[in-house]
């Protein structure tokens, strides 16, 4: 059964982009969008993402992705975060976050004013105390798995990221699956490890990788799970296209279809 759409947050999308039904929907990724990380903890988080927090400890998630894959690195699939997802929250969620910060600042200002007003005549006037030091939040761990178009063929893809950076792995699909444009992928928690799978229509689920450290030191409430689409390539228009007009494939959005999303 698909998850409730009301629990999802849109990242790098308008808040209205969350579909009413999560069983079948589409995400459109413009050119030059990606979810990636290079040292030192520099995130590229421009890919459209829909994610949700879980009421219960994460068990597994799976979905089928498909698209007209055309450009190098076109991709879409599942993503899981252990910590705050990097990127821009859309619409109402962003406004609510801004309101919370404003309210906190107003409360702090009121407290400071009240303290100054009530100071006795014997107290020595002093400058405002410096703000408390708040260390930056550690970069979140995340993993994405899906279907990616690379070297003119579709592959099962996975990326694992820590605060130090990310790695990228491609797996060739079996010959009987190589010409298909869809793939069902799954992520599953086993102990502290995150197992990454894809489904072969002949032999069933096949292991892509085991991420042994993913859930180590992670609170259940910090886990966020969802889907993403991205088109990292950005080649720009050719001279012919600029002269004759009309959008080329390099300037069009990648529309990724998601079917049968399940999150446990």
Language-model features: where?
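Extracellular glycan-recognition regions
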Residues: 1-264
């Amino acid at each position: 059964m698909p998850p409730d759409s009301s629990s999802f947050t849109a990242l790098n999308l308008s808040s209205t982009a969350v579909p009413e039904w999560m069983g079948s929907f589409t995400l459109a990724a413009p050119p030059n969008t990606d979810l990636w990380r290079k040292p030192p903890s520099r995130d590229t988080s421009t890919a459209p993402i829909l994610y949700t927090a879980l009421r219960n400890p994460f068990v597994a998630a799976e979905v089928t992705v498909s698209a007209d894959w055309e450009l190098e690195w076109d991709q879409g699939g599942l993503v899981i975060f252990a910590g705050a997802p990097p990127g821009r929250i859309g619409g109402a969620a962003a406004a609510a976050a801004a309101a919370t910060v404003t309210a906190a600042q107003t409360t702090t200002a009121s407290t400071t004013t009240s303290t100054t007003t009530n100071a006795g005549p014997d107290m020595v006037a002093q400058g405002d105390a410096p703000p408390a030091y708040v260390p930056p939040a550690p970069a979140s761990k995340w993993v994405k798995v899906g279907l990616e178009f690379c070297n003119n063929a579709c592959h099962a893809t996975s990326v694992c990221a820590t605060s130090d950076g990310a790695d990228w792995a491609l797996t060739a699909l079996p010959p009987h699956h190589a010409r298909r444009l869809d793939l069902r992928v799954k992520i599953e928690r086993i102990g502290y490890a995150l197992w990454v799978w894809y489904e072969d229509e002949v032999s069933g689920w096949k292991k892509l990788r085991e991420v042994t450290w993913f859930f180590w030191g992670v609170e259940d409430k910090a886990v966020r799970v969802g889907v993403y689409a991205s088109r990292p390539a950005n080649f720009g228009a050719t001279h012919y296209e600029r002269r004759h007009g009309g959008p080329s494939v390099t300037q069009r959005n990648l529309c990724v279809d998601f079917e049968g999303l399940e999150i446990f």
